[in-house]
């Protein structure tokens, strides 16, 4: 029985991956999830420079439900979820914060989802030097 508990713990750890990504000013990072035969989640904490904001471009391919594949983004207290529809889903999200959380969940190799994170320099305001 003790061995079964160890195996379950190892499986749970192996199916979730957390990654910290620092996108340099005016840079870009690909967010491609680790995909297994079963359910897997890849989580990113994306940060950028103080004078920048983050722009995400995400896509979910397929006609499955949110139970099969999804992308969740969190910017402060605001959370959004992108799921497949009758056709492929695509979204672009612009975040004010310098830190964004992204999680991609898949339940098999047939489900496709990915994002690109861009760091955009904030434009100077008219009263700034």
Curated annotation (Swiss-Prot):
Disulfide bonds: 66-83
GO CC terms, sorted: extracellular region
Key words of the record: Disulfide bond, Secreted, Signal
Post-translational modification: Contains 2 disulfide bonds.
Keyword Ion transport assigned: no
Domain of life: Eukaryota
Major localization listed first in the record, in broad terms: secreted
Coiled-coil region list: none
Tissue/organ expression: Expressed by the venom gland.
Signal peptide interval: 1-18
Subcellular location: Secreted
Domain CUB: 19-121
Family to which the UniProt record says this protein belongs: Belongs to the venom CUB family.
Designated name of the protein: Venom CUB domain-containing protein 1
Lineage, opening ranks: Eukaryota, Metazoa, Ecdysozoa, Arthropoda, Hexapoda
């Amino acid at each position: 029985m003790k061995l079964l508990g160890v195996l379950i713990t190892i499986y749970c750890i192996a199916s979730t991956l957390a990654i910290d990504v620092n996108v340099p000013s005016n840079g870009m990072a690909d967010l491609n999830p680790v995909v297994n035969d079963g359910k897997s989640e890849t989580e990113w904490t994306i940060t950028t420079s103080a004078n920048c904001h983050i722009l995400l471009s995400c896509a979910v391919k397929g006609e499955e439900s949110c139970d099969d594949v999804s992308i969740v983004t969190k910017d402060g207290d605001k959370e959004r979820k992108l799921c497949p529809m009758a056709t492929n889903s695509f979204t672009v999200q612009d975040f004010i914060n310098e830190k964004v959380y992204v999680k991609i969940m898949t339940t098999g190799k047939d489900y496709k989802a990915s994002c690109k994170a861009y760091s955009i320099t904030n434009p100077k305001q008219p009263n700034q030097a």
